[in-house]
Amino acid sequence: MSELSDEASEPELLNRSLSMWHGLGAQVSREELDVPLDLHTAASIGQYEVVKECVQRRELDLNKKNGGGWTPLMYASYIGHDTIVHLLLEAGVSVNVPTPEGQTPLMLASSCGNESIAYFLLQQGAELEMKDIQGWTALFHCTSAGHQQMVKFLLESGANANVREPVYGFTPLMEAAAAGHEIIVQYFLNHGVKVDTRDHSGATARMLAKQYGHMKIVALMETHSPVLPKSLYRSSENYEDLSSSDESWPVPQRQRPCRKKGLSIHEGPRALARITATGLGGKTPDSYEQVPPRGYVTFTSSDENTMEGEGLCYRDVTSPINERDVESSSSSSREEPTFCASLGPVWRSSSSDGLARAQGLSSEASIESNEDSDHARKSSVRKQTRTYLKNKSRHNNSDGHWPSSTGTARTPGSEPQAEKSPYSGPQDLATLLEQIGCLKYLQVFEEQDVDLRIFLTLTESDLKEIGITLFGPKRKMTSAIARWHSSARPPSDALELAYADRLEAEMQELAIQLHKCCEEAEALRGQVSQEQELRAVVESCLLEQDSARKDIHAQLQEAQTLAQDAALVLDQLRACQAELSARLKQHHSPSEATQNPPFLPADSKGWPIPLQALSLPELSGALEDRVHEMGIMLRNAEPGETTDAEWEEMEGTIARRDDSDVG
C-alpha cells in the first residue's frame, strides 16, 4: 500500500485547497470547490493538526461513521497515517468497530501492510481473530494481499494460522498457495500449520498451488509433507487435471470471493464528480470528450466485446499523489493499450502478485500495492505484457507442440509482421532427452516422477540433486531448458550452438558466484558486528580500570601527605622527650649535673618557641598535644584498627606517666 500512500508528497498537498477535477468545460467557481475539512476527510488525507483540533474540542463523536460506514480510525489505519492513528487511540476510540462489510481497523491495516498501525491496534485491545462477513480474519486479508512482513507479525502475535473461511473452506495457507506467495507459504510452513487440510472440494494447499501453476510452491510443500503414493495423484476419478503428465498445462482462472462493488477511495475524480453533481448546480454536465489531468491513466477498449460491463474503462489505476507512479504507469499504459483492453487470464509468477487474477477484478484488488511481496515487482507493464503473450502462446497450444517465436502486441498504426513458420518440438520428456542424446537418464526422471513440464522448471542444482552428476549431460539438459524458455529455434550450426551453451553456462556460473558473494557478505557483516560488540566490551573494561587506577592514585597521594605530617609530629615528639628527660635528670640528680657535662639542647623542629624556655608542666602539655595529633593521623591512615576509646586510654596513660615523671 506504500505506493498508494500520500506520505511521500504530503507537504505538497498541505498548501492546496481540497478540490476535485470536474472535467474540461465545467465552469465551477473557486468558492464552490473549497470544502471545509471534516474529521473523516482529515484522517484520510493525513491532516494531523485538523484531527488534533477535533479531538481537543471534545465536541465530536470520534467513533461516528460516515455515509460509507467508516470511522476516522478506519481511514487512518487503511491509508497508513501512524501519527493520526496514535492520536485517535490516545483519545480512546473503539478499535473493534467494523465497517458494513465487517472489516475492523486491524483488518484494513493488515490488507495494506501497515505493521506499525497493527501493532498500535493490538496494544489497545484489537481482536486478532475477529471475522468479517466473508469469514476472513486479519491474517486472511494480509495473506491475500501478499504482505509478507505483516503475515510474519500476525503469526508472532498469536494469530490462528489454521482458521478456515466458510465459503470455500480455505485456510490462510491455501490462500497463499493459490495466489503464489512463496515466502508467505514458507512462513506458514515454518510456523507449523496443517498442510493436509482440505477445502470443501477436497483439495489441499499443494493441489491448489499445482492447479494454478505455482510449481515452486508445490516443491516447497513436498519437502514439508509426507510422501504420498503415486496412485493418489494419478487417480482418474479425483483431480485428473492436476496430474503432472498433462502436457497442455492450462492455467485455470482462479475464482475469488466476490466483494460488494461500490465507490472506493481509488475510484478517481470521475466518481467523485458523479457524487458531487450538486456542486455544479444539480445538473449533469454535457457529454463531451474529456481528457483527464496528468496522473490519471485511462483504458480505452478497441474491441467492442472486450471487458464489456466490467467497469474497467476510464478507471484510474495510479495514485495522482505519487509523481513516480505518474511517470511509470501512465507511460506504460499508453504504450500497451491492446493488452490492457483485452486482459484475459494472466499467467502469474509464483513470487509476485501479478496484475490481476481474473477478468472480474475489483477496484480494490487490482491496484493494491504489495511492496513487501517481492522486491522484483517493480517491472513495468511492458515487461508483464511480453510475459503474458509468451506464456499464452506457450501454454495455450492445442496441438501440444513447442511454441513458435514470441508474438508481439500490435500497436496502433503499426503494420502486422509476417509470422514465422512454427517448428515441431518434443511432446514428452523421452522425445526431448532423445533429441539431446540423454535418453539413458529417462529412468532417473521417471523414478522421481518428473515429466516434461517439471523438467522444464529444473535448474542445474536440481539436476545434480536428482542424480545427473556428469558435466556433459547436465550441461545439455540446462541448455535445452534455456532454449525452450527463450522460445528460440535450435541453432543451425554447431558454432552458434556452442556460443549459446557457453553464454548459458556463464550466466549460471555468475548466478552461483553471486549467491556465494551474498553469503560471504552476510558472514562478514556478522563478524563485523561481533567485533564491534567485543570492542565495546573492551572499551568499557578499560574505562573501569582507568577509573580504578585514578582512585588508587588519589588514595596514595592522601596517604603520602598523612605520612609526611606524621613524620613531622614524630620529630617533635622526639625533641620534646629529649628535653623532658634532660630536665628530669637535672632535677633528681643536681650533684651529678655538676660533675657531668650538661646535655646538649634538643632539636626543636617545628616548635614555635625553644623547648628550653618551657616549664615542666608546659612541656608535659605540649607532649600530650603531640601524642593526640599522632593518634589522629594514625586513625586517618588506618581507620577501623584502633577504636576511639583505646586512643583516649593510650593518651591518658602517656599523660599520667608524664605527671609522675614531673612529680
Curated annotation (Swiss-Prot):
Gene3D superfamilies per record = Ankyrin repeat-containing domain, Transcription Factor, Ets-1
SUPFAM superfamilies to which the protein is assigned, alphabetical: Ankyrin repeat, SAM/Pointed domain
**Per the record, which residues fall in region Interaction with NEK7?**
1-421
Bias (Acidic residues) ranges: 641-651
3-hydroxyasparagine modified-residue sites: 96
Composition bias (Basic residues) maps to: 378-395
Give the domain of life.
Eukaryota
Where Phosphoserine occurs, residue numbers? 2, 5, 201, 225, 243-245, 319, 366, 369, 373, 540
**Biased amino acid composition, Basic and acidic residues:** 322-337, 654-663
* Region annotation (Disordered) ranges: 242-261, 278-425, 585-604, 637-663
Where does the record place the SAM domain? 424-487
ANK repeats: from-to residues: 34-64, 68-97, 101-130, 134-163, 168-197, 201-220
InterPro entries recorded for this chain? ANKS3_SAM, Ankyrin_rpt, Ankyrin_rpt-contain_sf, SAM, SAM/pointed_sf
Phosphothreonine occurs at 318
UniProt GO cellular component terms: cilium; cytoplasm
- Post-translational modification, as annotated: Hydroxylated at Asn-96, most probably by HIF1AN.
**According to its UniProt record, where is this protein located?**
Cell projection, Cilium; Cytoplasm
Q: Which residues form a coiled coil?
A: 500-575
What SMART domains does UniProt report for this protein, alphabetically? ANK, SAM
| Assigned keywords, A-Z | ANK repeat, Cell projection, Coiled coil, Cytoplasm, Hydroxylation, Phosphoprotein, Repeat, Ubl conjugation
Q: State the domain notes.
A: The SAM domain mediates homooligomerization.
Q: What interactions and quaternary structure are annotated? A: Homooligomer. Interacts (via SAM domain) with ANKS6 (via SAM domain). Interacts with BICC1. Interacts with NPHP1. Interacts with NEK8. Interacts with HIF1AN. Interacts with NEK7; this interaction alters the subcellular distribution of NEK7 by preventing its nuclear translocation.
Name the job this protein performs: May be involved in vasopressin signaling in the kidney.
Tell me the protein's name.
Ankyrin repeat and SAM domain-containing protein 3
* Species per Swiss-Prot/TrEMBL record: Rattus norvegicus (Rat)
